């Protein structure tokens, strides 16, 4: 999405473009405050992970480290970068598309062979400063033809 920095893309975008690897760390309601700390617009030579006092662990298939606080880590390789129309002059806007090559899920969040989304309470970014937590889950059968 649009970069909060006025001089170009986010550091994360630049790192992915340069290294072709990244980790998607799923944020939960419990970790929302630490996740928010990583949004601090620091200088390029400063680490948002260090700023937020987050611990990392070695990833299994990619060089970038995974966050220990995240119960799900998706290790990815860059597939494609899609440039989008610029909203404000001088800013960058684009989407990174990755191929997931490995997933780590903490056992506590697996129930009957599936991710227990209700226990996980993942965050969803809605836009602006708005977020949501997934805590109301229901199933619906797909319609069939007769």
Give residue ranges: language-model regions.
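Basic, polyanion-binding surface patches
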Residues: 1-146
């Amino acid at each position: 999405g649009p970069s909060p920095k006025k001089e170009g893309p986010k550091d994360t975008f630049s790192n992915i473009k340069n290294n072709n690897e990244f980790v998607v760390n799923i944020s939960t309601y419990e970790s929302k405050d630490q996740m928010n700390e990583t949004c601090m617009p620091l200088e390029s030579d400063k680490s948002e992970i260090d700023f937020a006092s987050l611990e990392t662990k070695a990833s299994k298939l990619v060089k970038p480290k995974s966050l220990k606080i995240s119960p799900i880590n998706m290790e990815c390789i860059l597939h494609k970068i899609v440039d989008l129309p610029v909203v404000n002059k001088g800013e960058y806007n684009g989407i990174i598309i990755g191929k997931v090559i490995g997933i780590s899920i903490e056992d506590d969040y697996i129930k009957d062979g599936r991710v227990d989304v209700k226990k996980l309470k993942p965050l969803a970014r809605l836009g602006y400063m708005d977020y949501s937590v997934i805590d109301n889950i229901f199933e619906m059968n797909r319609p069939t033809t007769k």
